[in-house]
Amino acid sequence: MATEGNNLSQYDKNTIPNAKDFRFGIVVSEWNEEITEGLFQGAFDAWIENGVQKENIVRWNVPGSFELIYGCKKMQQSFEMLDAIVAVGNVIQGETKHFDFVCDGVTQGIKDLNVQTDIPVIFCVLTDNNIEQSRARSGGKHGNKGTEAAIAAIKMAQLRKDAKFYKG
């Protein structure tokens, strides 16, 4: 396993753009709440640590990971001033093909939002084989994918800002 023994949430703060003026949205699935709350906390803490003001973070909840697509789309439409959105979910492999359908649908839906709209949506959906893997990646021994998603959101917000500058 590529992540075995590694905490993937370590980053060099000096390589992160100044985020004090950025505004972020985060849409969180209520399914597997233990995991998604850990991911949310990782993202929130990373934003605060990098200068984002609490009042510049908007959170919405949706029932499950499949609903993240609609939640992110509506957040884009409702808060056009947002610089990026993070979609937080967790799908754990079961005995049926439901896992595959949900994972494929969410992945394609988030991709479509990125292609069709101007506010970047960061994919922070854990797709693990079991709950232990999810725990390890939501604040456990492998770090917190929520932290990584927040850093990606900051970098994409900066890219979006830079692209607008060059466009004129």
Curated annotation (Swiss-Prot):
The protein's enzyme class: transferase
A GO term for molecular function: 6,7-dimethyl-8-ribityllumazine synthase activity
Keyword Transferase found: yes
Pathway(s) it belongs to: Cofactor biosynthesis; riboflavin biosynthesis; riboflavin from 2-hydroxy-3-oxobutyl phosphate and 5-amino-6-(D-ribitylamino)uracil: step 1/2
Sequence positions that bind 5-amino-6-(D-ribitylamino)uracil: W31, S65, F66, E67, N90, V91, I92, F123
InterPro entries hit by this protein: LS, LS/RS, LS/RS_sf
E.C. numbers: 2.5.1.78
Keywords: Riboflavin biosynthesis, Transferase
Disulfide-bond pairs as recorded: none
Keyword Transit peptide: no
Function: Catalyzes the formation of 6,7-dimethyl-8-ribityllumazine by condensation of 5-amino-6-(D-ribitylamino)uracil with 3,4-dihydroxy-2-butanone 4-phosphate. This is the penultimate step in the biosynthesis of riboflavin.
Record-stated family: Belongs to the DMRL synthase family.
PANTHER family the record matches: 6,7-DIMETHYL-8-RIBITYLLUMAZINE SYNTHASE (PTHR21058:SF0), 6,7-DIMETHYL-8-RIBITYLLUMAZINE SYNTHASE DMRL SYNTHASE LUMAZINE SYNTHASE (PTHR21058)
Name this protein carries in UniProt: 6,7-dimethyl-8-ribityllumazine synthase
